[in-house]
Amino acid sequence: KELTGQDLLDAAGIKAGEVDILDGSPPCSAFSMAGAVVQGGGHTKGFGKTKKYSDGKKVENIEDLFFEFLRVAKEIRPKVIVAENVAGLMMGEAKQYYYKITNTFEKIGYDVSSMVLDSSHYGVPQTRKRVIFIAVREDVTEAVGLTFMNIAGIFPDKFSEAITCGDAFSDL
């Protein structure tokens, strides 16, 4: 059975539009930089290649999972959606997929902003770049007077220089 937003709402005992924040990280390993080899300005891993998964009934493209997340989000209608994915989504041919994601946010009624953040700038002893999407339902942005620039301003400034594992564990 396909999971619906209504299934989740029923399980939580709430109605569409009552969820404040929906946070998700749908896998998009086809766009991951892990193991990618750069040749002639392009990446040989991931971009344009289809990875598949099977739930025992059908086989689907793994990159379609982001749109499944957005399908469920449309049904739940949270005030804010936060989503995280690999930074490779913002590079080369994958950028078309990124645009498809942002267009889908807009089609389902959300104002969206995104930024690549590196965890090492936020006190994590690891360099891990991720694109973060913050989407606010249009009626909420109108009610509180948010604009695209206000949403973009939600992203935090980097607050630390990169730290090592030794730095992180030195006082334990």
Question: Where are the regions a protein language model picked out?
Answer:
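SAM cofactor-binding core of SAM-dependent methyltransferases
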Residues: 1-6
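Class I S-adenosyl-L-methionine
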Residues: 7-19, 29-172
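Hydrophobic beta-strand segment of the Class I
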Residues: 22-23
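Conserved NAD(P)H cofactor-binding loop of Rossmann-fold oxidoreductase domains
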Residues: 26
